[in-house]
């Protein structure tokens, strides 16, 4: 059974510069921490939620540890300066999966996301392995049943694997099957894909599903493809697997990328998504604090979350 917990106030701490000026504030001073999961109380705000789960990573023979990511990322976010957009963040706590019930955890996240979106919030989820994406994406599809939903994944992997059970490598095949069941088009784009990390079978499945695929080698000239994809859909779900980054920027993941796409280029790609007015949901997944020796990788991941909230329109 997946359980919900409010976040400890000790996570949101940092340097206090308020004596300098009224607007010299950091995120730990502007994030609202809710003691209850009550999205109906926070319309037009951004629901910050953790999905503490790495059961999908374990099933996918990866390096476990991502279940500890949500709180590690909160700590990294806490001391960052608060600018426009960050005052909308409401921390709605963590959903903590109980192994081995991945499917139940995904359903719980799906329901929570749907509730947030139907209450007028938008969702920023801190995973968790990339199994987060099925629960998160399904909640978005449920909330916007009459509109076209585009899924944008920044990832070294297509995550269209076919297995008997759900894993961190299957979320977009699961979402494609959900779209089939709901008789809607599966709009999926994956940027940063490593051909060396995806088999021909996965590539063939992407072609069969009409997936927009941009390889890691081509991401430096991919803004036009991103803009075209944004224009085709009504609502957007953005998911960032941190293994899209090169290993020298992001070693703390289950499967570090030998090549990857640098952070500055990832930010350039997601800026038009965030500013489009269509983004309803975003997540950061696969961060593994066990492999982050000095906290540098957490700061890299946190900068992505910081930037999304700042640019979100």
UniProtKB/Swiss-Prot annotation:
Protein residues bound to Mn(2+) 2: 155, 157, 241, 243
Keywords of this entry: Histidine metabolism, Hydrolase, Manganese, Metal-binding
Co-factor: note: Binds 2 manganese ions per subunit.
Any coiled-coil regions, as ranges: none
Gene3D superfamilies hit by this protein: Ureohydrolase domain
Gene Ontology MF terms: agmatinase activity; formimidoylglutamase activity; manganese ion binding
The keyword Metal-binding appears for this protein: yes
EC numbers, comma separated: 3.5.3.8
Any one GO BP annotation for this protein: L-histidine catabolic process to glutamate and formamide
Annotated residues for binding of Mn(2+) 1: 130, 155, 159, 241
Keyword Metal-binding: yes
Cofactor(s) listed: Mn(2+)
Record's catalysed reaction(s): N-formimidoyl-L-glutamate + H2O = formamide + L-glutamate
Function: Catalyzes the conversion of N-formimidoyl-L-glutamate to L-glutamate and formamide.
HAMAP family, per database record: Formimidoylglutam
Family: Belongs to the arginase family.
Protein name per UniProt: Formimidoylglutamase
Species for this entry: Salmonella arizonae (strain ATCC BAA-731 / CDC346-86 / RSK2980)
